[in-house]
Design a protein with these regions (language model features):
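Flavin-dependent oxidoreductases
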Residues: 31, 188-269
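Extreme N-terminal leader/targeting segments of oxidoreductases
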Residues: 1-20, 38-39
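Helical element adjacent to the flavin cofactor pocket in flavoenzyme catalytic cores
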Residues: 151-209
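Dinucleotide-binding Rossmann-like beta1-alpha1 core, especially the glycine-rich loop
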Residues: 61-139, 256-269
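Conserved Rossmann-like nucleotide-cofactor binding loop
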Residues: 28, 51, 217
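Glycine-rich FAD pyrophosphate-binding loop
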Residues: 37-57
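Glycine-rich Rossmann-fold phosphate-binding loop(s) that bind the pyrophosphate
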Residues: 24-26, 48
C-alpha cells in the first residue's frame, strides 16, 4: 500500500523485569514507550515482528479533528497539537503536514449531514467550514466530478505511516526504553489477582503494569486476565500511485472513495 517501512534495528536483550511492559510495536505502543521513558519509567516494548509491521504502517495517515465524535475531541485536539511538534519531539521528519482534509458532499443530504458537525467544531473553535464552488475547485485541481460542497478543516493534516511509528520507536530507545523485536508475548501473568508480568517466547519479564497495544491481537491477550475487548474486523481495498505532478495536496473522503497525497508525491486511494 505504501512505501517500505523505515527499519528499526534489533539489538536490545530481554531483561528479567521492568516497571512497565508494552505489548505491540505499533504507533500506540511506541508512543506510550516514548513518554514513559521520558518520565524515567523502566519500560520494555515487545513486538512479535518489526515496528509498524501491521496496521500502523497501512493506515491513511490522517491527523484530524474533523468529523470526530464530540467525546473524542478533547483528546484529539491535544493530540494534534503534539503532531505539530512531532519533529522536535522525535528528531526526525515523519511527513506531518497541515494540508487540510475535505469531506465531499455529493448532494444536499450530504451537506445537511456534514453541516450538523459544524456545531461541534464551533464548540472547540476549530477552523472547519463548509465550502463550495471556486473555493472547493481550487483545492481539487484536475477533478473530473463536480461536488455540491465539502466540509473543510485547513489545519487538519497527514503524516507518513511508514515513517511515524519507527521514528517514535527510535526516539523511545534513545530516551531509555528497551525495544524487543521478534519477541512475541504469549500471555499475561498474574499473582494474587494482580498483573505480575508477561511470558514471551524468550521467557518471563516481571512487571507490575502491562499495556496491551497489540491491535487486532489485543482481545486475545486480554482474555488471559478476564477482560473482554470487543473488536470489529473491517476489510477494505487500498491502492497507491506512483508520484504525480500537480493534483490536490490535501486529503479527501466521500462515500466509497478517499485519497491522500503522500510525501513521495504519489497518492494513497
Amino acid at each position: 500500500m505504501g512505501p517500505p517501512v523505515d527499519p528499526v534495528p534489533a539489538g536490545d536483550s530481554q531483561p528479567k523485569s521492568a516497571d512497565v511492559v508494552i505489548v505491540g510495536g505499533g504507533i500506540i505502543g511506541v508512543s506510550t514507550a516514548l513518554f514513559l521513558a521520558k518520565r524515567g519509567v523502566s519500560v520494555v516494548l515487545c513486538e512479535k515482528g518489526h515496528i509498524a509491521g501491521e496496521q500502523s504502517s497501512r493506515n491513511w495517515g490522517w491527523c484530524r479533528r474533523m468529523g470526530r465524535d464530540p467525546r473524542e475531541l478533547p483528546l484529539i485536539v491535544e493530540a494534534l497539537k503534539m503532531w505539530g511538534d512531532i519533529e522536535q519531539l522525535v528528531g526526525e521528519d515523519v511527513g506531518f503536514r497541515r494540508t487540510g482534509i475535505l469531506y465531499l458532499c455529493q448532494d444536499e443530504s450530504d451537506v445537511e449531514h456534514h453541516s450538523e458537525w459544524l456545531k461541534t467544531a464551533g464548540d472547540y473553535a476549530l477552523d472547519t467550514r463548509m465550502i463550495e464552488g471556486r473555493a472547493l475547485a481550487d483545492l481539487m485541481p484536475g477533478a473530473q466530478k463536480n461536488f455540491r460542497a465539502a466540509l473543510h478543516t485547513p489545519s487538519d493534516g497527514r503524516a507518513e505511516p511508514q515513517k511515524a511509528a519507527p521514528a517514535i520507536a527510535r526516539a523511545a530507545r534513545r530516551a531509555g526504553a528497551q525495544i524487543l523485536l521478534r519477541c512475541a508475548v504469549r500471555g499475561i501473568e498474574t499473582e494474587g489477582g494482580r498483573v505480575s508480568g508477561v511470558v514471551t517466547e524468550n521467557g518471563l519479564i516481571r512487571a507490575g503494569t502491562v499495556v496491551v497495544a497489540g491491535g487486532a491481537w489485543s482481545s486475545r491477550l486480554c482474555r488471559d486476565v478476564g477482560v473482554r475487548l470487543p473488536q470489529l474486523a473491517v476489510r477494505s481495498s487500498v491502492m497507491r500511485t506512483a508520484p504525480v505532478e500537480g493534483g490536490p495536496d490535501g486529503a479527501a473522503w466521500t462515500e466509497g472513495f478517499a485519497y491522500r497525497k503522500r510525501l513521495d508525491g504519489g497518492y494513497t486511494i
